[in-house]
């Protein structure tokens, strides 16, 4: 109700709302064995329920952008963040649903960003993600530059991240064979063939 009231107030006092950028996050990292309903609820409510409320409250608005900040963890996982990954997977589903309705939606599965946000306060998580990806996290300036390109492309889902494909493929053996990473695997093999040839 609060989100609907806010959107209604904006409609009365401002020019038409053109876009939504949902970047809320809540963390309650726990190993799967230690997850409980309260932990799941806290993380899902902030990310997924918040996004759903924005979706419903803006259905009558002439939006050109509806951007949801997700995480690379939906593609590669991260120990202790099952609730966070689940919430972000929900955002990906919401973006797909909106696009199927002919509404704008882009879900950005950000890779680690070194100098802004959560990872600046959580070195252990930053180091774990960098190890899984095989590269240093993105710089905030680089992420903002990529955001401009993402908006221009109108993609449904993108995952901007620095990663080393051989490192990632070793940690996720199914990635080397699976359809989800097929284009990356193909490009890596093609680049290797060109280098060797």
Where is each model-derived feature located?
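4′-phosphopantetheine-dependent carrier domains
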Residues: 1-179, 186-197
């Amino acid at each position: 109700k609060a989100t609907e009231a806010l959107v209604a107030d904006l409609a009365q006092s401002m020019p038409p709302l053109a876009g939504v950028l949902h970047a809320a996050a809540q963390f309650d990292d726990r190993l799967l064995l230690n997850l409980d309903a309260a932990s799941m609820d806290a993380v899902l409510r902030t990310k997924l329920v918040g996004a759903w409320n924005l979706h419903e409250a803006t259905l009558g608005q002439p939006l050109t952008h509806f951007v949801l900040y997700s995480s690379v963890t939906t593609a590669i996982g991260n120990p202790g963040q099952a609730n966070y990954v689940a919430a972000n997977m929900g955002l990906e589903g919401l973006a797909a649903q909106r696009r199927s309705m002919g509404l704008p939606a882009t879900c950005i599965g950000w890779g680690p960003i070194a100098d802004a946000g959560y990872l600046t306060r959580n070195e252990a998580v930053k180091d774990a993600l960098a190890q899984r990806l095989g590269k240093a996290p993105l710089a905030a300036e680089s992420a903002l530059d990529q955001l401009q390109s993402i908006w221009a492309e109108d993609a449904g889902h993108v995952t901007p991240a620095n990663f080393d494909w051989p490192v990632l493929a070793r940690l996720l053996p199914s990635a080397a064979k699976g359809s989800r990473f097929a284009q990356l695997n193909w490009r890596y093999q093609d680049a290797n063939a060109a280098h060797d040839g």
